[in-house]
Amino acid sequence: MVKAEETVGSVWIINPDLLAVRISEHESIGLTDANRLAVERIEAWLYASVDAHQTVGVETVLSTPKYRKLVETAKANGFSIRMLFVYLDDPDLNVERVRVRVATGGHAVPEDKIRARWIRSFDNFAWFLREADTVDVFDNSGAEPRRILTKEGAELTFFEEPIPALAEAVRSAFGHDLTWTDQDD
């Protein structure tokens, strides 16, 4: 979230997973309890940042609508909402990346939760796409992220044909079907 009159510079991005590990290590508690504390502290920091008119960002799977109220509060306080939405084009790839993360010491997530979160993230994205002032959407399925879509105000620009889940989120956000024309035709 960025105050409308600010320029974008350094933005504190809160990563819940890294914060939970830090809490677990420094407060000598299990990771499950540390995750809960991280979520509670992040929510408090985000609202405190809005109250202090301080730009802040948060990384989220977007599998719940919990940040909607924060966005509404920030907008009511003059913030411009900027969103980066990064997805993988298939939940199988999400499952594989979690396996790799676990193999390198990261935390596990049950496969059924990964798959359910993939679907819910697109469902929730529709609301944030509609409400955000600026949105950049990237597909991170390959070796390099690819920009798929941008939104500036009410204008959407597609750089590639969206996957069905993204197309449905856009349709849900704006209430109409998309027609895609290849730019090379």
Task: Cite the ranges covered by each PLM segment.
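Conserved substrate/cofactor phosphate-moiety recognition/catalytic segment
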Residues: 2-54
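A generic structural signal for alpha->beta connector loops
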Residues: 10, 78-80, 131-132
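Conserved nucleotide-binding/hydrolysis micro-motifs of P-loop NTPases
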Residues: 18-20, 63, 87-93, 142-144
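Residue-level signal for well-ordered alpha-helical positions
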Residues: 26, 70-73, 97
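Short, surface-exposed amphipathic charged segments that create phosphate/polyanion-binding patches used
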Residues: 28-29, 96-100, 149-154
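Glycine-rich phosphate-binding loop used to anchor ATP phosphates in small-molecule kinases
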Residues: 34-88, 121, 136
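A glycine- and Lys/Arg-enriched "phosphate-lid" helix/loop adjacent to the NTP-binding pocket
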Residues: 77-125
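NTP-dependent small-molecule kinase module
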Residues: 129-185
